[in-house]
């Protein structure tokens, strides 16, 4: 299938490489011409993914119009750019094209809503949105380290299309979920627990304290998630 990946940061490049590995026709977009020129010339991003070579088969462009012909559009832009990028996409992609957001967090510019809500609002609700989220590091995905992730959406068809695009039999397992609220909130709230776990380490409190903090933190995430509509 044709996949258009918006964003050439570490995560965007890693996912573009995975999709290319899976046999898809992949285009990566950046809004910076100098970055586009550098990636064309060097075929790598030494700052974010040192030693990782971007395959020649991945097209790199500053022209977003190619998204109009894509079966799947992947949003891998910084969180502050999600809304503005989705607004541009709304003028380009046809209705029903699946939009996959791979960022985590909440949209502080729009009342701390979930990013799937931000995208859906920007695109007038005409496109199914998938949250692709999980315990993942870009550099490990780029190097083919075994990884598991979840594609969550209110649209089962959109989640399964995303699963089919990203999953392979060697190193990338994709599960599907209808609980997009829970998946997005979990991806955002876990950062708070991660900070607390780091503080525990810094204070030298040991494994017992950190384990207790993480366990109770997971319980709080689940309780708060349910209050906010998660399953």
Can you name each region flagged by the protein language model?
Residues 1-52, 61-62, 113:
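NAD(P)+-binding Rossmann beta1-loop-alpha1 motif at the extreme N-terminus of oxidoreductases
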Residues 54, 65-146, 162-164:
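Rossmann-like NAD(P)(H) cofactor-binding subdomain of soluble oxidoreductases
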Residues 57-59, 172:
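Short, conserved active-site loop motifs that form the nucleotide-linked donor/cofactor pocket
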């Amino acid at each position: 299938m044709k996949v258009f990946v918006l964003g050439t940061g570490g995560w965007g490049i890693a996912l573009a490489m995975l999709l290319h590995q899976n046999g898809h026709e992949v285009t990566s977009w950046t809004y910076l011409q100098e970055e586009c020129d550098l990636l064309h010339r060097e075929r790598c991003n030494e700052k974010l993914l040192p030693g990782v070579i971007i395959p020649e088969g991945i097209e790199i462009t500053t022209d977003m119009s190619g998204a109009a012909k894509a079966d799947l559009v992947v949003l891998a832009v910084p969180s502050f750019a999600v809304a503005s990028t989705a607004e541009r996409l709304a003028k380009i992609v046809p209705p029903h094209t699946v939009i996959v957001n791979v960022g985590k967090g909440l949209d502080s510019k729009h009342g701390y809503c979930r990013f799937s809500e931000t995208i859906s609002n920007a695109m007038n609700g005409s496109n199914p949105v998938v949250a692709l989220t999980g315990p993942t590091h870009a550099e490990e995905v780029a190097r083919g380290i075994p990884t598991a992730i979840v594609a969550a959406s209110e649209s089962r068809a959109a989640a399964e299309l995303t699963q089919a695009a990203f999953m392979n039999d060697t190193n990338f397992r994709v599960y599907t979920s209808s609980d997009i609220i829970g998946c997005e909130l979990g991806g955002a709230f876990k950062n708070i627990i991660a900070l607390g776990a780091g503080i525990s380490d810094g204070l030298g409190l040991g494994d017992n304290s950190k384990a207790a903090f993480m366990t109770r933190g997971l319980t709080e995430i689940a309780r708060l998630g349910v209050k906010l509509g998660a399953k």
